[in-house]
UniProtKB/Swiss-Prot annotation:
The lineage of its organism: Viruses, Varidnaviria, Bamfordvirae, Preplasmiviricota, Tectiliviricetes. This is Core-capsid bridging protein. GO terms for cellular component: host cell nucleolus; virion component. The keyword DNA-binding applies. It comes from Murine adenovirus A serotype 1 (MAdV-1). Its main location: virion. HAMAP family: ADV_CORE5. Induction: Expressed in the late phase of the viral replicative cycle. Monomer. Homodimer. Exists in equilibrium between monomers and dimers in solution. Interacts with the histone-like nucleoprotein; this interactions bridge the virus core to the capsid. Interacts with core protein X; this interactions bridge the virus core to the capsid. Interacts with the endosome lysis protein VI; this interactions bridge the virus core to the capsid. Interacts with the peripentonal hexons. Interacts with host NPM1; this interaction might play a role in virus assembly. Associates loosely with the viral DNA to form an outer shell around the nucleoprotein-DNA complex and links it with the capsid by binding the endosome lysis protein. Dissociates from the viral genome during entry. Might be involved in nuclear capsid assembly of the viral particles through its association with NPM1/nucleophosmin. One of its GO terms (molecular function) is DNA binding. Keywords: DNA-binding, Host nucleus, Late protein, Viral capsid assembly, Viral release from host cell, Virion. It is found in: Virion; Host nucleus, Host nucleolus. It holds the Pfam family Adeno_PV.
Length: 228
């Protein structure tokens, strides 16, 4: 007996469609040889009816209807009562979903700025008690009685003028040689006269006379005939 088994394609190539009828082989359209599970088989074309898969729609959930809030608790009415304004921005859609995000800005007029007081956070400062002498009582001179403190009166301050210090003189490194020589002469002239005791006899220093310098002729020197 000849084997007449038919291998059908169980893979779903179109996920958006679902089968209605089973696969019916059509032998008259030819066949092709393919490899299925390491076995060489002849694949014949089949016919099957498919329909579009219905979309899963969201179930309609009844939305509860809440009673309107009183004006005292209604935020929109509270903003309107305060003279404010509600600004609604453009709706933004969340990518990949059908949801949207609405942003609402509430603008309220600010007339009075609130500054918290430091005194509200700490108790009031109490000044320390002071001993005040009674009025009309005279004490012994040896007893010193402190007078009540009075406001200190400071004299008006005068504006001090800044005196410029004289410019420093140039150092010897920046002075010329003529200035240094002139200064040395001045120092030599201002030396005080020395007076000795009469018992001390000081003779003036005697320097030997300088011998006249004779002209020295260089050895092996030839002069011009005009020089005698």
């Amino acid at each position: 007996m000849e084997d007449s088994r038919v291998y059908l394609d169980r893979s779903n190539a179109t996920p958006s469609y679902i089968p209605v009828t089973p696969q019916i082989p059509v032998p008259g359209l030819g066949h092709r040889r393919v490899k299925r599970e390491h076995v060489q088989v002849d694949e014949e074309p089949t016919v099957q009816i498919l329909i579009k898969r219905p979309k899963v729609e969201d179930e309609e959930v009844p939305i509860p209807i809440f009673p309107p809030l009183p004006p005292a608790r209604d935020p929109v009415a509270a903003v309107a009562a305060a003279g404010g304004q509600i600004v609604r921005r453009r709706r933004r859609r969340v990518p990949g979903t059908a949801m949207g995000v609405d942003t609402v800005d509430v603008v309220l007029p600010v007339g009075v700025r609130y500054h918290p007081s430091i005194e509200a956070a700490r108790p009031p400062a109490v000044p320390p008690p002071r001993a005040v002498p009674p009025v009309g009582v005279r004490y012994h001179p040896s007893i010193e009685v402190a007078r009540p403190p009075a406001a200190r009166i400071s004299p008006p301050r005068r504006r001090r003028r800044r005196r410029r210090s004289p410019r420093p003189r140039a150092t010897a490194a920046y002075r010329s040689s003529a200035e240094v020589v002139e200064r040395r002469r001045r120092v030599a002239q201002t030396v005080p006269v020395v007076r000795y005791h009469p018992s001390i006899q000081v003779e003036p220093a005697v320097h030997p006379p300088l011998a006249p310098r004779l002209p020295v002729q260089m050895a092996y020197t030839r002069y011009h005939p005009t020089i005698h």
